[in-house]
Amino acid sequence: MNTKILAGLFSMAALFSSCNDFQEINEDPNQVDESKVKPEWFLNASIVGDQMNPEIAERMFILTWNRASRFNRGSGFTIGTDNNDYITRYLSNDYAVKWLNQATKAVQLGEKKVADGEADLYPYYKNVIQMARIWRAYLNSEVSDGFGPIPALDAFSGVPGEYDSVEAIYTFILKELKEAEAALDPSIDMSPMSAEDAFYAGNVNMWKKYANSLRMRLAMRIVNANPQLAEREFEDAASKGYISSLSELASVQEKDGWSDLTSVMSRTWNAQAMSVTFKNLVVGLGSNEFPLPDSLKAHLKNPHTYMGLYLDRHFPLTTNDPCAGFYFDGVPQYVDPRAPKLFSVVGWNDGVVYSDYIGAASEVKPVSLFDPDDNTKPMLTIDPRYTWGTWVAGEWDVKGSLATELTGKNYNYPSMSKQYRMSTQKRVYFGPWESYFLLAEAGVRGWDVPGSPKSNYENGVTASFEYHGLLSEVGAYLSSTEYNRIGTSVSFDHTTEAKPYIVNYVDPYTKENKTMTYTYPKNSIYRGGAYNNDAMTKIFTQKYIAQVPWLPEEVWSDHRRIGLPFFENQAVEKDYNPLNQVPLTVATSKECRLEFYPKRYRYPANIQTNNLEGYNKALELLGGPDVVETALWWNLK
C-alpha cells in the first residue's frame, strides 16, 4: 500500500492548478521535469484542491455529506439516493484521484530528491515528505470512508492496480501517521516553503499535532472492527501533543470568486436549511435564551412547555421525529447558544446571520395551507415571520401539495449563517473540540488517556463556544440539566433519563388550546434505545453541534460507527423505493434501524464497464452488494 496511490480507472488528466511558481506547470505527472519542481508544490496543490471548488463542493459537501450528516434539511442522500454524476466527478482525475496523486507525488519526489542529495541544499524536503504522508492519510480516509475499498494504481504507471480493503487502508494510514509524526524534525528551517503550506505555513510542530489528532480520530473509527488496535493506536497518539487550542486549528483560508478556495457553502441557490436533527439537538439544550432584540421578544415561546401548532392534516406523521406534525409558530426561548449563530431567524435580517441568498427577509409573508378535501381551497393561514423551526423532508405524498406555499420557499426555513457563505472564513479540517471529545469517549471506554471524561467533555464544549465567541456563556451552560427534544442535557454529571411529560399545543383547525404527552424518541441502534442521557450520548450531542458546519463527513462517520446522535427518519407517507432509497415503509416509519441510514455511496457506474474484474474484487472486499446500505468494515453492525 505504501507504494500505491488511489486512482480511478480513467485516463490521466493534465496536472493541477496550484499557486505561485507552480501555476506555470501544466504537464502530465509522468512527463514533468522533476528538476523544475519541488515536492511542496504538489502537497499544497493537493491541500488546496481538497478545499473543493464550487462544482464539486456543491455535489459532495452540500448534497452528499451535508445530507448524510443531517447538517441540512433535504431528501436525496439523506434517504439513500446517491447521484452517479456527483460520485463519478468526485472519484476522477479532476478531483479526489488528482488530490491523492499529488500527495503521493510529493512523497515520492521528496524521497527522490533526498536520495539524490538535494536535501543538503533544501533540508526542509525531509519534513515535506512527512507532511505529505500525513495529508495523504487524511485523503485516503476521506475517500474510502465514502466508498469502501478503493482501487490503487502503481505510482503514476498508468496500470490499474488491485483494490485495497478498508481494513488494509486503515492499517496503512495509522502506520503512516505514526511514522510520519515521529520523523518530523522541528529543528529544520521551513521558511523557504511556508507559502506552499495552506494548513500551517510550514509549522512542523502544528503538523505533528495534526498527525496525532488525526490518528486519534481514525483509531477511534475502527473501535468496532479492531478494538485492540484502536485502543493501542489511540493511547499512543494521545500521549503526544494534539490539537488543543484554536490557534492550532487545521484549516484552509477561503477566497472569494470561483476557485478551489471558494467557500464550500457559497452557492446562492443552495438553501442549506436547518435540519430536524440539528433542531431537536439544540432546542431546549442549556438554559440560555435565544438572543432577540426587545422588539421581537414577544415571539419567544418556551419549548419545554409548548410544542406549537399541530398540523396533522398537512404535515406528515410517518416519522419517528418526536415533534412529528408540529409547526413551531415562534422562536424557541431556550436553545444552545451556538445555534442562533449558525441558522437565521425566518423573516428577520439581523445583518449578521441572515443571508439574502435565500431571498430577502421582507419577502416572507403569511401563507395558505390547502384543504385536503379540496386542494384548491385555502384552509389555514400560517405566518412564518419570526419563527425558528423546521420539519422532515422525505416522501410527503399528497400532503406535499397542500403545504407547498410554506415548505416550497427557501426563506421560510432557518438557513445557514451568512458568514459561512461569503468565502471569508477558514475551512476547518480538525478543531480542538474534536480532540477533547475523542479523549472523553476514550475515557468512557476505560482507555488510558490524559484527563477525565468529564474534563475532556467540558474542554470540548468550551473550545466550541470559544470558536463562536461565546466563552462568557459556557459556565452556566455546562451546569444545565434541561433536556433537548431528544432527552439529553448538558451537565456531564446529570444522567437521569428524561420521562414523558405533559406539554401544551394549539389545534389550528379548531383554534383550541390542548395538551399532549411528549415522548422522547427511542434510539434503538444505540444500547437498545434505553439511553438518551448517558455519557456517550452527551459527548456525541456536543460533538455534532461543534462540528457544524465544517465537518459533515466526520459526523456521518460517527453515526455509522456508534449510532449517535439520534437521526430521525424522514417522512414516509408512501413506501420508499428500495432500488434507490433506504428500505423504509409506512409500516416501519416510526422504527429506528441501521438499514434506514446510508452507509456509503455506490461506485461510479463506469467502473463496472471499464473494469468488471476490479469492480467484482471491490465487492468481494466490501463484503456485500454495491448499495448504500452495505456497511463498511468499521461500521456499527
PLM regions and their residue ranges:
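An aromatic- and glycine-enriched ligand-binding surface/loop that stacks and positions planar moieties
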Residues: 20-73, 217-389
